[in-house]
């Protein structure tokens, strides 16, 4: 059974007499443990897809299943539990608490995730064992992004959702961050979903979903995806 299924999902935003169809009857499925890239230009519907899968928004029409459960039918309280237990988020900007140390930032998830990994373990995975007691202001942009990845993964989510995770980074640091995400997909069996407009990142994916004007244009499985080092920026 796929870990994710979208079935005829539409999302329509209404403002006065105006309707905007951000997604139009979208259907696809994803298997567990895949590295997935949702690719498309600005305004294509990529972020709407991510928000729906993350339980941050609900569809106007259609069904969304995660591990066989219809999350489109969940109440607000149930969606909060879903966000806490099932999905992790990594954004383009790091959203770290400046007054907390690196370790303390990662430990924040212990308050909401019952099966959280130890902060030290996740920070070791992202190569930051030597920075446990540093504050975010003492880190580079790439290091801060790796802290945000460690924090998201410390929740032990089934699915990690990433919105342009390397968008604010230089190419060398971006490759480093993508290597970490690939490693987590392979070593922990996590399903990684990245939203991006960068076509080069799509070359690394097991599955590429191309979105345009709120519709799925194609879903492509890549038998031999490139490594992060092979991708030209």
PLM features: residue spans?
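ABC family nucleotide-binding domain
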Residues: 2-211
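Conserved beta-strand-loop-alpha-helix hinge in the C-terminal portion
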Residues: 215-233
């Amino acid at each position: 059974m796929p870990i994710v299924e979208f079935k005829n999902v539409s999302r329509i935003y209404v403002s006065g007499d105006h309707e905007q169809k951000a997604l139009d009857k979208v259907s696809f499925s994803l298997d567990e443990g895949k590295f997935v890239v949702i690719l498309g230009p600005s305004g294509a519907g990529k972020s709407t897809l991510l928000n729906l899968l993350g339980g941050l928004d609900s569809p106007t029409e259609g069904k969304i299943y995660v591990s066989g459960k219809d999350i489109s039918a969940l109440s607000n309280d149930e969606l909060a539990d879903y966000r806490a237990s099932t999905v992790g988020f990594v954004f383009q900007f790091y959203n770290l608490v400046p007054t907390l140390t690196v370790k303390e930032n990662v430990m924040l998830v212990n308050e909401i995730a019952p099966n959280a990994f130890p902060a030290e373990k996740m920070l070791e995975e992202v190569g930051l064992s030597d920075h446990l007691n540093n504050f975010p202001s003492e880190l580079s942009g790439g290091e801060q992004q790796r802290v945000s990845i460690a924090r998201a993964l410390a929740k032990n989510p089934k699915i990690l959702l990433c919105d342009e995770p390397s968008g604010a980074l230089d190419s060398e640091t971006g490759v480093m961050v993508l290597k970490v995400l690939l490693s987590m997909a392979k070593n922990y069996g996590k399903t990684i979903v990245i939203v991006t407009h960068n076509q080069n990142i799509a070359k690394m994916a097991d599955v590429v979903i191309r979105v345009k004007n709120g519709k799925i244009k194609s879903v492509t499985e890549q038998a031999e995806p490139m490594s992060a080092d092979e991708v030209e920026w």
